Amino acid sequence: MGRAFQNRKESMAKTADAKTKVYSKYGREIYVCAKSGGVDPAGNLALRGLIDRAKKDQVPSHVIDKALDKASGVGGEDYELARYEGFGPGSCMVIVECLTDNPNRTFGDVRACFNKAKSKLGTPGSVSHMFDHCAILAFAGSDEEAVLEALMEADVDVTDIENEAGRITVFAPHTEYAKTKQALADAFGELDFEVDEIQFLAQTMTPVAGDDVAMFDKLLVTLNDLDDVQNIYHNAELQG
């Protein structure tokens, strides 16, 4: 029982750490989004989508409110986006997005993670050209033509629309996020989005096999342990 109890304690600690990371991630993103685009979700669609995602991930209201309160005040932390690109184990491509108040510290931390996993940090643009920077919105529905028509009438530059298993997924350039979401709201009212985010989607996948799999996992774990890291995108396809 002693060992089982210890395992349970460790599992609870890991869960608590994971929740803390999620709360911190959303708190920082909400703060930056509200600081740049306004604290009113009605006039800041990116913020509204971010808050909706946070609630779906069970982020407590007090975490969201605290971030908004900080953003509405004068001064506060000065976070900026830092994006790093590099090559992971098996020559897979990796993009790491951070929000940081100290770019030099964050760069050093991210580089150390790459080095420990026998990976190499590249220069800006070294791998991002192999990814599509997309706005992705998914919701329950089946009338693909009606969705496409609504988006075209709103002059949205649609990249693709998927209709699968009763779910419509719209892909558009990341710069069209707010326009796409507004067009859908105008045409279909308030939608419950299953996916509502901006991502880097790999154009091609790279197989990662053998010892490289463990090294790749190590890279992801160490990067995710960094407070400044918000998102990690890659094109690794793990084998075996």
Curated annotation (Swiss-Prot):
Pfam families (alphabetical): TACO1_YebC_N (PF20772), Transcrip_reg (PF01709)
Gene Ontology CC annotation, any one: cytosol
Record's subcellular location: Cytoplasm
Gene3D superfamilies cross-referenced by the UniProt entry: 1.10.10.200, 3.30.70.980
Keyword Cytoplasm: yes
GO MF annotation: an example: DNA binding
Regions annotated as coiled coil: none
Key words, A-Z: Cytoplasm, DNA-binding, Transcription, Transcription regulation
Name by which UniProt lists this protein: Probable transcriptional regulatory protein Csal_0810
Organism: Chromohalobacter salexigens (strain ATCC BAA-138 / DSM 3043 / CIP 106854 / NCIMB 13768 / 1H11)
